[in-house]
Each structure stands twice: as structure tokens, then as C-alpha cells.
Amino acid sequence: MPTTNGKADGTSTPARILDAALASFATRGYEATSLDALAAGLEVRKQTILYWFPSKEVLLDAVIDRSAAELSVALEGSLATAGPGWVRVEAVVRSVFRLAARQPELLGLVREMGRLGPPAATRFVAALEPLVGRASEFLEAEMDSGHMRRHEPRLLLLAIYSTVIGMLTEVELLRALGEEPTTRSLVRRRAEILDLLRSALVTVP
């Protein structure tokens, strides 16, 4: 029976498999990823992967669940220390940019979920639903108080998501073309998004 022992750094075998699968799904795509290739890259037998994750579909579900949990923790952490109103929106955008810089494969997975559609995308959205629900309630309260312009909260969240992910996707495209964005350019892009969102949302300076 395979053990959970992994690398000398203490990373368990299941965690290593999930890391490798995430990287491959994010860069190569789900269909182009094979368990044989993952096993070869990890220097384990294919049966070891299948012991922990009985099929490629189960592996994808596990990657989605872990990635959604990591995203939720990062966003919840930024919100826990943020103030009210616009400051909370700004905190989320900054958190997403930091996460994309540290773990670009998460951004790649989000794009891949959009391409795959249901049931993978549905599972990812469902995992984030508690966070989305709280965000919708926050936006509704800000609109009711007159601090933000009136929009349908969930449609507004979708627009914010599309704007931020679109900008980050452009950054990843530049990397793919061999042009590594500088810290200054990333800060400038983040500032541009924040200015755009603030002008579209905030009614009170």
C-alpha cells in the first residue's frame, strides 16, 4: 500500500500529486494532461496516483476543492483586516493580485474551469458560494446605504471578477510570450483596475 511519505521537505504524496495536477491542468489543460505523464514527472507509478485518486475525474475534483479552499482562505484573510465600504473591495482586488503573483497556476485553473464548463465549473462555483453570498450581502448593504451605485449584486460581482481576471490573464499572456512583467507594471495595472472599479461603484468620496 502506498504511504503518504513524499519528498524530504515533508510534502506528502497526495499533496505532491495535487500540486503536479494543478500545474498541468493550469498550463496544459485538463484533456491534455495524462496520469502517465504526471506519474513520470513525480517519479511514481501510475497506480500510486490511482490509489489516492481513483480516476482523472476524481483528481480534478480534488484539485478544484483544494484550490477553491485556498482562494477562500486568502480572500477571507484580506477581508478580516479590511475596513468598511470601498476599502473591502480594494482589499479583495489586492489579495487576488498577490495570490496570482505567488500562485499563477491558480489563475490558470480558474481559466480552465471556465473553458471546461459544467460539471467542473459548477463544482468550483459551488465551493465559493459561501464567500460569494457574503460578498453579495455586503454590496447590497453598501448600495442600500448609498455608498455604492445600485446594481444587481451578483451581476456586479461577475463584472468585477471578469475585469480582474481579464487583466491578470493579459499578464499571463505576456509571460507566455517571454515578456516578464515588472513589479512596477503589475502595481500600475492593479491601480488602473482599482481606479476603474472605484469610479464605477463609489458614489461618496
What spans do the regions from the language model cover?
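Amphipathic alpha-helical segments used for helix-helix packing
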Residues: R88, A100-T122, E170-L177
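C-terminal peripheral helix-coil segments that are non-catalytic and often amphipathic
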Residues: M1-T3, R98, R102, V132-S145, ...
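Short alpha-helical scaffolding segments that buttress acidic/His motifs in well-ordered protein cores
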Residues: V93-V96, L109-M113, I160, V164, ...
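All-alpha amphipathic helical-bundle segments outside canonical DNA-binding/catalytic cores
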Residues: V87, T122-A127, M143-Y161
